[in-house]
A protein has these predicted regions:
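Gly/Ser/Thr-rich loops at beta-strand to alpha-helix junctions
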Residues: 12-15, 87-92, 152-153, 238-241, ...
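Accessory alpha-helical/coil subdomains and C-terminal extensions
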Residues: 2-4, 8-15, 30-31, 36-41, ...
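Short acidic, glycine/serine/threonine-rich loops at helix termini
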Residues: 18-21, 95, 120-123, 154-161, ...
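Short Gly/Thr/Asp-enriched flexible loops that form oxyanion-binding sites at enzyme active sites
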Residues: 85-106, 242-251
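Short beta-strand segments
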Residues: 8-10, 84-86, 109-112, 144-150, ...
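Internal gly/pro-rich beta-alpha loop/helix module
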Residues: 110-182
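ATP/nucleoside-binding phosphotransfer catalytic cores, i.e., glycine-rich phosphate-binding loops
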Residues: 244-326
Length: 326
């Protein structure tokens, strides 16, 4: 018996065509038309389509992400699994958010495209077909939210977009893909390291990101301190090191009780207490700094916003990051 899969469309390049006047891609394809363009889709699953939105993924925000999560949970009793089509610019953020906040354990697979629907060799239809097959597979249950493009399956927690235009743009730079979509089966080589779920009462926290550079002054961090933030991500050099003038401002923010998470701008690897010189992660430990593990700054920002919707206690937030990010 075929599985019932609900495809929820949100927009993105996958639902765009070239505007004949401007020559650029614009939203133009409905959810139903997206599904209709996939050859042989009905042979793999019974598919229904829900059009959540049709916007570029740069327009997504945490409120829309939360609404999407609630839409999926609200339909969970009516489907065996879900596919979410999404623009690739912020796909990894929405997938990560869903992985952190969904109640359902039914398979959820997020996909997109790097070429518009009117482009030569559009990659959207194949990616949708593969994602539907992933969501319909019994092997996908309990794997957390998945991301599937170019027949590779990734954990939402670890995946990232690493090229601006190449269709083969998604990677897990730490552990590699979870599995692969083959012509007749889905094969997983490993399971995700693990995931927990948080259910925030609100998402009103104001969380900024600041990226460090060599010779950076402390004025940006001073401005962050004056902005009445609820939390701050500092994207540091190396394995978690900042210029000395930044460290001084961060210590002040920490003493004022601001939850701060330290991430690294390096694409692969983790923040660690490797050094003890002035500006190292170890030298700032007394400020209450939270280490972000191998989370990117943008995923750490989401996790901090979600955590702040659950608790305002900095030590409880630290415990959440230790469970999720390490």
């Amino acid at each position: 018996m075929k599985k019932h899969i609900i495809v929820i469309t949100t927009g993105g390049t996958i639902a765009m065509k070239t505007d004949p006047v401007t020559g650029g891609l614009v939203p133009a394809v409905s959810g139903e038309d997206l599904a209709a363009a996939v050859p042989g889709l009905s042979s793999w699953a019974d598919v229904d389509v829900v059009e959540f939105s049709n916007v570029p993924s740069g327009w997504m925000d945490t409120e829309k992400m939360l609404s999407l999560a609630r839409t999926i949970d609200g339909l969970a009793d009516k489907a065996d699994g879900f596919v979410v089509t999404h623009g690739t610019d912020s796909l990894e953020e929405t997938a990560f958010f869903l992985d952190m906040t969904l109640h359902t354990e039914k398979p959820v697979c997020v996909t997109g495209a790097m070429r518009g629907a009117s482009d030569l060799s559009a990659d959207g239809p194949e990616n949708i077909l593969s994602a539907v097959r992933v969501a319909a597979s019994d092997r996908s249950r309990g794997m957390g939210v998945l991301v599937c493009l170019q027949d590779r399956i990734y954990a939402a927690f670890d995946v990232t977009k690493f090229h601006t235009t190449n269709p083969d743009t998604f990677r897990d730079l730490h552990y590699g893909p979870l599995g692969t979509v083959y012509s007749h089966e889905i094969i997983y080589g490993r399971r995700p390291i693990g995931h927990l779920r948080l259910h925030p009462s609100s998402l009103s926290a104001k969380v900024w990101m600041v990226t460090c550079w060599s010779g950076m002054e402390g004025d940006i961090l001073r401005a962050a301190g004056e902005a009445q933030l609820d939390g701050l991500i500092v994207d540091a050099l190396g394995c978690g090191n900042v210029p000395p003038k930044c460290k001084a401002e961060m210590m002040k923010l920490g003493e004022a009780g601001l939850p701060m998470v330290l991430t690294t701008r390096v694409p692969s690897g983790s923040v660690m207490e490797e050094y003890s010189y002035d500006g190292s992660a170890l030298s700032m430990k007394k400020s209450g700094l939270i280490l972000g593990g191998h989370l990117s700054a943008w995923k750490a920002r989401l996790l901090l916003a979600i955590a702040l919707g659950v608790t305002g206690d900095r030590e409880e937030i630290r415990e959440i990051f230790e469970k999720f990010a390490h």
